Amino acid sequence: MADSGIEQAFSSALLPTGTRIACRIEYDGSGYHGWQAQLKSSSPTVQGALEHALERVAVQPIRVHCAGRTDAGVHGHAQIVHFDAPCTCSAKAWVLGGNSHLPPDVRIHWAQPVPEDFHARFSALARRYRYVIVNSAIRPALSSRQLTWQRKPLDAVRMHGAAQALLGEQDFSAFRA
């Protein structure tokens, strides 16, 4: 039996103009100046790359909204985005067509119609962040963009204690830009 997520990601059923589409994307943010497109800058952003690719599929402008903006160099593993389809198109066309116009460090994993009141940012139930610290004498060569390296010994007990304050549901609104 086929996985329903795969079936939906590649559904050939046409979705009418105006349908709100949600997508799961992933990206290596190393080469980008964050998520958000900058009006007066030619610096590459993930939003800019994604909108450009989807606009090539639709042959019309598209504005993409995300669950959470990331800073320069930050990666996204399961970022949910949405847009209102400016044309009749299938989920398969959004995924495969979008990916054909994206650079290799940005990918659309699935696309599906969602209710018109869905919003990637405000409908999110949770967000998860992962930080990887490698503590070794030698800096790793593989996956070096997805981690931070520390040569000197770390105090794991103190780090664990400090991290407890971050667990659970928190209000980090004071840290917003």
What label would you give each PLM region?
Residues 2-177:
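Structured-RNA-binding interfaces characteristic of tRNA pseudouridine synthases
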